[in-house]
Amino acid sequence: GDVYKRQGVDRDPQAGKVGMASAAGCCHSFTPDGRCITLLKVLLSNACCYDCAYCVNRSSAQTKRATFTPQELAELTVDFYKRNYIEGLFLSSGVIGSPDHTTELMIECLSYLRNELLFNGYVHAKVIPGTDPDLIDAIGRLADRLSVNLELPSSTSLTKLCPHKNAETVTKPMSFIHRLRVSEERQLLEAKNASKGIVKSAGKSKGIVIPTQKQIIKEGLALRSNCLKNTFMRSSRVSSGKRSFSPAGQSTQIIIGASPESDNQILHLSQALYQQFELKRVFFSAYIPVIEDHRLPELDTPVPLRREHRLYQADWLMRYYAFSPDAVSYTHLRAHET
């Protein structure tokens, strides 16, 4: 149960509001009792000024474009919720003009959804790299979870396949989200201690102190395995229900098979993301060849679904059973298995 509750946010029904949220994770996740959580996974717009090689909605693609109005998408979400089609919203968008303008439209949609339609269910929102920090703060107050897609496993591949993106623009919002969550956790803990009459010792740091390896073991926050490493799961001292900014944390997605990186490289990257930004999940997405481009695999290349599955298994071993990337990538993940 606790394994799943760390992935989402609990919010009870409230008088006069529509819906609730259960700490069961993201799109198409399963609860311990086997229940599938369904989210409306939708783009505000498939129009995009970026030209990422692998994307069917890239600016150079000859495809029909459609854009919801913020109010239209909010009303659609509530309508689907009332019909019991969905239990929440997973909102993303192509880049309409600029990251800031696109995020402003997403904020308008979520603000109408929360404040006018009184939707109290789960919301996951994508953050576009390059978005102004103030807008990230604003959308994080409306969404339960934020995610910034890393897209590709190396800066080289990102530069090659996504000419409008680079590693810095992707990791910068991740770092900002992490800092805001840590800051809010510190403030909530200080308020809790103050209400109990607990006074901090002089000279102590006001920041959140990441536990040392010995502290983690002593506090029982980590399982251990034959590789004798700590897991990446730092238990928050503040429940998600008390947070106002991205209470269910942040995640990211990596496309598998569009670029030449090995499973070992991908898992080492995942490890770094968990440790540096305290991500809740790294999602893996098998690349489906649908676009002819000399930078991409041939159209008849098999979709690496088994590889995606094995990476998820390895990710689980790393996060909950303390395996290192090197311990699983060779023994359990045959190189580029398809």
Enumerate the language-model features and the residues they cover.
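Flexible, acidic/Gly-rich N-terminal and inter-domain linker regions that tether
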Residues: G1-A47
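Conserved small/polar residues in nucleotide/adenosyl-binding loops
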Residues: V3-Q7, T331-T338
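Short, charged beta->alpha transition segments
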Residues: K41-L43, Q71-K82
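Canonical Radical SAM [4Fe-4S] cluster-binding loop centered on the CxxxCxxC motif
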Residues: V42-Q71
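Hydrophobic residues within beta-strands of alpha/beta enzymes
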Residues: C55, G88-L91, L146-V148, V282
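Short acidic, glycine/Ser/Thr-rich loop/turn "cap" segments at secondary-structure junctions
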Residues: N57-T63, L89-P99, V123, L158
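Conserved AdoMet/S-adenosylmethionine-binding subsite of the radical SAM
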Residues: A74, G97-W316, Y321
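Short Fe-S-cluster ligation motifs
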Residues: F80-S92
